[in-house]
Amino acid sequence: MTADVLVRAAELESVWYSGRRAWHGPSGELVTGARIAAVLASAAATLRREGWAPGEFGLREVLAGDRDLFMVARQVLELVICARTGAGAAEPVLWDLVPGRTVGQVLELLADGAAYARRNGPASAQEVSA
């Protein structure tokens, strides 16, 4: 992970979304940066423990559960992928299916996403409305 990737992801967020919309799930509820960082760290721990099997057990499976958490985590990972690749859009649950992708790359994406969420995610609803 480099600081440049985190800075670029923040720049992309400001272009892609008005305000802090990326941090609200489909229900409209705010998801804090700390919560997303915890979700991504837990996903990485699960992949380390259970193993990564593209197409069978990957990002889609370890992020499954609460819809708000899934969608915001997906948006954070998309920002990081696009910051790395220069792409205009990316689907993280397809990114980990690319032939030649390694578990190390998947774990690095999750770590970078968690770092981005801790660094740039809102701490509370008051922070978003400010």
Language model features with spans:
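N-terminal leader and targeting sequences that precede the mature domain
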Residues: 1-4
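Short terminal alpha-helical segments
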Residues: 6-54, 110-114, 127
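Short, flexible helical or helix-coil boundary motifs
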Residues: 13-19, 47-50, 66, 70, ...
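Charged, low-complexity surface segments at secondary-structure and domain boundaries
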Residues: 19-30, 60-64, 90-99
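Alpha-helix boundary/N-cap detector
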Residues: 27-38, 68-76, 97, 101, ...
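Non-catalytic, well-ordered alpha-helical scaffold segments
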Residues: 41, 57-60, 104
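Amphipathic alpha-helical interaction modules
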Residues: 49-80
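Amphipathic alpha-helical binding modules
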Residues: 82-130
